[in-house]
Amino acid sequence: MVKLGCSFSGKPGKETGDQDGAAMDSVPLISPLDVSQLQPSFPDQVVIKTQTEYQLTSADQPKKFADLEGQRLACSHPEEGRRLPTARMIAFAMALLGCVLIMYKAIWYDQFTCPDGFLLRHKICTPLTLEMYYTEMDPERHRSILAAIGAYPLSRKHGTEMPAIWGNSYRAGKEEHKGTTPAAMTVSTAAAAAAAEGNEPSGKPLDMREKEDPQKAEDVPSQSPK
């Protein structure tokens, strides 16, 4: 420690000295410091001044104003922006459901179901009456429309048949009509008349028969007196 008021002259018996030297010896080496002197005081408010330089061209100014207007409109109706994606999702779901229903109707409903009175056979709705009638038929023939015509019994014939006599005469007349001579026509008519009376046709021309008739008439009286 340093003792206050001590002299460093090294001569304790000497009391002479200047007043200035005595004053310097009496000043302490370490003096206490005040804390307020170490921390400066800060002001309560600070004002900062800045300066900015910018220029707007006539072409960029309306674009910026338009963007600001669009942002203002978008921010003013936030609910409309939320409803738009929801409406799109609902429309997409409805379209998908419609496609599924159409595929179901085309693949399953129409192919594997038949109305009342019909039976499903080979993925085709056929009436029960036809199914009972054509049970023993081939499936390929059963599908065709001509199956009913082909399966119709041929023994049933509607209408009356022509008599044999008239049928023969008609066929004979049709065959002889192709000839060129009128004698053939007369023979055919005579044959038809003979067939109608029940006699067999002679097959000779009419002129020859007329020549033979007088001879037979002469022979008959000549034979009677005998």
Swiss-Prot record:
It is found in: Cytoplasmic vesicle membrane; Cell membrane. The chain crosses the membrane at residues 89-109. InterPro entries: NSG (IPR009431). Residues 1-23, 189-226 are annotated as: Disordered. Residues 1-88 are extracellular. GO terms for biological process: anterograde axonal transport; clathrin coat assembly; endosomal transport; positive regulation of clathrin coat assembly; positive regulation of endocytosis; positive regulation of retrograde axon cargo transport; postsynaptic neurotransmitter receptor internalization. GO terms for molecular function: clathrin light chain binding; protein-containing complex binding. It is a single-pass membrane protein. Residues 110-226 are cytoplasmic. Coiled coil: none annotated. Its main location: membrane. Expressed exclusively in neurons (at protein level). In all age groups, expressed at significantly higher levels in the medial prefrontal and orbital frontal cortices of spontaneously hypertensive rats (SHR), a model of attention deficit-hyperactivity disorder, than Wistar Kyoto (WKY) animals. In the motor cortex, dorsal striatum and nucleus accumbens, expression is significantly elevated in SHR only in younger animals. Keywords: Cell membrane, Cytoplasmic vesicle, Endocytosis, Membrane, Transmembrane, Transmembrane helix. One of its GO terms (cellular component) is glutamatergic synapse. Residues 206-219 have a biased composition (Basic and acidic residues). PANTHER family: NEURON-SPECIFIC VESICULAR PROTEIN CALCYON, NEURONAL VESICLE TRAFFICKING-ASSOCIATED PROTEIN 2-RELATED. Interacts with clathrin light chain A and stimulates clathrin self-assembly and clathrin-mediated endocytosis. Belongs to the NSG family. Interacts with CLTA. This is Neuron-specific vesicular protein calcyon. It comes from Rattus norvegicus (Rat).
